[in-house]
Structures are given as structure tokens and as C-alpha cells.
């Protein structure tokens, strides 16, 4: 990463100069370390400011349904990955998620594979890709990495359990929900779905709304039916208010 290398080179150069002018080695080292830290923070902020500006522009394009333009902008920002640590992972997460939400799973997969592990939604999508490719071991490993990075996400634990249950491993699905409850004591959705599995029922995920539907684990017909039911409920509430 260029920012680290530049900061380290500057620190070493200053250390050498200070040693040549007979400054005690420990004092020179302290100055060099301070320079390294300060310069690295400064360069990182400059780089991230550029990256965030591109992400903000891409976000506006997404809101305007200009998906391909947003993807091009994010891909262009990958050049900053050489400068700053974790930038590539964050950008690959965003690109992969856009492709995935467009149902372009083949293009989404290679970007999701390079996702930042703390982007739990991208990691969830990657795990689902492994599940659909009949790679259960990789699915489990991906979910384990995701819950380690984002242990307080209720949907992530429920999604993990859902996929395990879909793979026919109800016991492991229950264990995932139990682990989730240890991280999120009293979480209503985790408790409800654990009870559902214990009673031999299906997991209920629709209460998560659009956050759940973005994973495309339900058919379009089921999603449309849910949306129509929700629309009908809103219309009934409006009618009651008018009365």
C-alpha cells in the first residue's frame, strides 16, 4: 500500500538524518514513529476523501436507477486500492452487491469473493452464492467470518440459520440462532425463528422487509404477493383514517 510505504520511507529518512546529527537513537526513533503515524493518517484521509466522493456519486446514480454508471464509477475507484488498505474490499463489496441485487449473479460472484468481511450484507450474498453452487463448507466458512465481523446483526444470524435449514441441517440452524441470541439477548426475531424450528415450522424472514428481499431467496411471485398484501394493508389503514 503506497500510503504505508511513503510514510515508512519518510520516517526512515528522518531517522537516518537524526542519527547522523548525533541525536540519541531513542529520540530519533520517537520522532520517526510520530512522523510515520502523522503522515500515514494525513495520506489516508486524502485518499479516503477521494474514494468517498466517488461512492457518494455512485450512490446518487443508484438512486436514479443508473446501475451501470454506478458500477463503472466504483470500478474506476479501485485504483485507490493500491494506496489505502481495505479500500479494494469495500469497493468490491459495493460492486458485487449491485450486481447481485440486479440478479446478475455470475458477475456478482468474483467481486463478492473479494468483499470486506465486515460488510455483512455482501458476505451474506457470497455465502448464498456458495449455497447455490452446492458448496456448503464454503457457505458455512463465509457465514462464520461474517458473524465474527458483525456479531450484532440479527438478520445475518437469521440468514445463516435460514441457509443451513435450506441445506437440510436443522440442528446447525438452531445452533446458529442460539449463538445469535448469546450476542443479541432477547432479540425477538431470533427467538421467534428458534421456536419455529423447534416446532418444525418454517423460518419467518419477511419481517425484515427489503433487507431480506435483497438476498433473492424468495421467488418473484412470492415477493410480489407480499408487496400487494402490504399495499392492501396500507390502503385499509388510509380508509380507516378517512372515516
Locations of the language-model features?
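N-terminal topogenic membrane-targeting module
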Residues: 24-30, 36-106, 111
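Compact, basic/aliphatic-enriched, mixed alpha/beta core segments that act as assembly/interaction modules
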Residues: 148-186
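Alpha-helical repeat scaffolds
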Residues: 73-75, 105-113, 137-150, 171-180, ...
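Long, non-transmembrane cytosolic or organellar matrix-exposed soluble domains/tails
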Residues: 172-243
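Alpha-helical adaptor scaffolds
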Residues: 81-155, 159-162
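Conserved small-residue packing positions in alpha-helical repeats and bundles
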Residues: 51, 57-59, 89, 95-96, ...
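Helical anchoring/docking segments at protein termini
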Residues: 1-50, 222-243
Amino acid at each position: 500500500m503506497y500510503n504505508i510505504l511513503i510514510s515508512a520511507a519518510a520516517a526512515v529518512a528522518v531517522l537516518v538524518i537524526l542519527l547522523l546529527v548525533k541525536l540519541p537513537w531513542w529520540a530519533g526513533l520517537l520522532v520517526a514513529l510520530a512522523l510515520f503515524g502523522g503522515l500515514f493518517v494525513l495520506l489516508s484521509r486524502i485518499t479516503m476523501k477521494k474514494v468517498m466522493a466517488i461512492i457518494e456519486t455512485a450512490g446518487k446514480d443508484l438512486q436514479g436507477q443508473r446501475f451501470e454508471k454506478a458500477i463503472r464509477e466504483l470500478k474506476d475507484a479501485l485504483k485507490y486500492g493500491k494506496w489505502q488498505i481495505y479500500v479494494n474490499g469495500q469497493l468490491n463489496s459495493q460492486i458485487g452487491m449491485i450486481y447481485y441485487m440486479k440478479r446478475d449473479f455470475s458477475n456478482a460472484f468474483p467481486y463478492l469473493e473479494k468483499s470486506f468481511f465486515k460488510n455483512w450484507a455482501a458476505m451474506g450474498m457470497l455465502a448464498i452464492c456458495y449455497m447455490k453452487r452446492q458448496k456448503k463448507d464454503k457457505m458455512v466458512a463465509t457465514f462464520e467470518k461474517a458473524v465474527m465481523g458483525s456479531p450484532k446483526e440479527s438478520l445475518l444470524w437469521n440468514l445463516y440459520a435460514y441457509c443451513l435449514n435450506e441445506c437440510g441441517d436443522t440442528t446447525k440452524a438452531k445452533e446458529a440462532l442460539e449463538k445469535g441470541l448469546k450476542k443479541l439477548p432477547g432479540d425477538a426475531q431470533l427467538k421467534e425463528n428458534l421456536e419455529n424450528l423447534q416446532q418444525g415450522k418454517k423460518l419467518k424472514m419477511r419481517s425484515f422487509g427489503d433487507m431480506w428481499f435483497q438476498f433473492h431467496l424468495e421467488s418473484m411471485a412470492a415477493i410480489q404477493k407480499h408487496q400487494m398484501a402490504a399495499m392492501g394493508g396500507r390502503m385499509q389503514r388510509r380508509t380507516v383514517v378517512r372515516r
